[in-house]
Design a protein with these regions (language model features):
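Basic/polar, cationic surfaces and motifs that engage anionic cell-wall
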Residues: 1-90, 115-121, 127-208
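Short Gly/aromatic-enriched secondary-structure transition segments
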Residues: 42-49, 98-107
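Alpha-helix N-cap and loop-to-helix initiation/capping positions
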Residues: 94-98, 163-164
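Active-site-adjacent structural elements in enzyme catalytic domains
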Residues: 104-108, 174-177
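Gly/Ser-rich "nucleophile elbow"/oxyanion-hole loop immediately N-terminal to the catalytic nucleophile
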Residues: 112
């Protein structure tokens, strides 16, 4: 596992001051609901041939474009993950760059006109490699669960039908201890949140 700070993945600053919050030893588990197993043929093509779409999140601000860009980035990430699992060894730099691009995409979407939040919703973003990315600073209020935004929000980049990797699970437990989180539940277990998040597979893997 490697932990990447906001400066390392290229975070934009919050649009306003974030409210302080104590997690009280509590965490809330989410998934991105973006299938990392999505087939490339089902994804829209880049608007310009050969264009690096994951560099355009800040310039293409409409919610529909942001969603398409995130889907493309996750599809590209899935190809690299499949190869990495076959090859083994260290996580290649290209895979890390994909992860950073996806996190930037999440932040751009969350701060954009569709959501209008001050910053990325979650405090921690976890990938199949076990790498974790700093989202909102710990000790600030998130935007991830009604009535529970004071808790530390963990987002696993996976969707319904995906199985979390062992690296994901191990990294989550290692990080939550560092974050002072002793008790955690799934998003759907928080009162007032009508959702299937974080999905059946992650719910089972974490015994939620």
């Amino acid at each position: 596992m490697k932990f990447y700070t906001r400066s390392e993945w290229g975070a934009a600053p919050p649009s306003d001051d974030l409210s302080p919050a104590s997690n009280g030893g509590q965490g809330t588990v989410h998934y991105s609901a973006s299938r990392i197993t999505a087939r490339a043929k089902n994804m829209p093509k880049p608007e310009k041939p050969g264009e690096k779409w994951y560099r355009l999140w800040r310039n293409k601000a409409t919610p529909a474009v942001q969603r398409r860009n995130i889907s493309r980035a996750i599809t590209d990430y899935n190809r690299k993950i499949a190869l990495w699992k076959k090859m083994g060894g260290e996580v290649p730099p290209a895979l890390v760059e994909n992860e950073k691009a996806i996190v930037r995409g999440f932040q751009a979407f969350h701060q954009g006109p569709s959501r209008g939040w001050l910053d990325i919703a979650y405090h921690r973003i976890i990938f199949a490699t076990g790498n974790i990315y700093e989202g909102r600073p710990l000790g600030t209020t998130g935007a991830h669960a009604v009535g529970a935004n004071h808790t530390t929000g963990y987002c696993f980049v996976m969707g319904e039908g995906d199985e979390p990797t062992g690296q994901m699970i191990d990294s989550f437990h290692e990080q939550r201890v560092k974050d002072g989180v002793r008790h955690y539940v799934g998003h759907r277990q928080r009162p007032g949140n009508s959702t299937s998040c974080p999905g059946a597979a992650l719910t089972a893997a974490l015994d939620l």
